[in-house]
Amino acid sequence: MKEREKVVRLAKLAEQAERYDDMVEFMKTLARMDVDMSAEERLLFSVGFKKTIGARRASWRILESLEQKVTAGDQPGVTINGYKKKVEDELRAVCNEVLSIIAIHCLPLANSGENVVFFYKMKGDYYRYLAEFSTGTEKKAATDQSLMAYQAWPCAQLFSLLEIMNSPERASQVAKQALDEATAEINSAGVEGYKDSMLMMQLLKENLALWTSELTGGETSKDDDVVMEG
């Protein structure tokens, strides 16, 4: 059995056993083989990290809620804050590791438009997770990076469809859907400072509509508004 196949099989086994930390380690090994991941492999990569980060995000939200219920400076509040910072350190470590792997091993090796789209979306998600608990300049940097990734993956999907299908109309529809999904992700995140990002998303959508109009002879979708919440 080839090493790549063995690692994938072990990752599947770890998933079945709900040992997600092990699953992540196996998929990190695969990513560092510098291969263009198959659909199955990239899903395993994503699921492993999503399970790992998901549990910690849930813990952070619980601690954040508990901290808000105590008086500032009280001993219980100090204890909660210290424990919350420990969880934040774990979140930061996981996010930074995912982003590093995507930047070094995943995007450079992605030969298909589908893979490029997948990893840009994942990149945007993990910068957004960083922004959820960060403050100050760290929060702004994570927010900006998340926006850049979310801007990139709808465009990557559009160009991929144009290349494969030679269908500007269909490509525009799928790219619009991708952009709408990214907008929904940002709206639901409730992260302070994302309103500026939403304005930039609106500009991106307008540019996409204009470009598509040129390709299709002037016909554009009328449903081009981004709904901003919160």
From Swiss-Prot:
Matching Pfam families: 14-3-3
Gene Ontology cellular-component terms listed: cytoplasm
InterPro entries: 14-3-3, 14-3-3_dom_sf, 14-3-3_domain
GO BP term (any one): protein localization
Family: Belongs to the 14-3-3 family.
Protein's job: Is associated with a DNA binding complex that binds to the G box, a well-characterized cis-acting DNA regulatory element found in plant genes.
This protein's name: Putative 14-3-3-like protein GF14-H
Lineage of the organism: Eukaryota, Viridiplantae, Streptophyta, Embryophyta, Tracheophyta
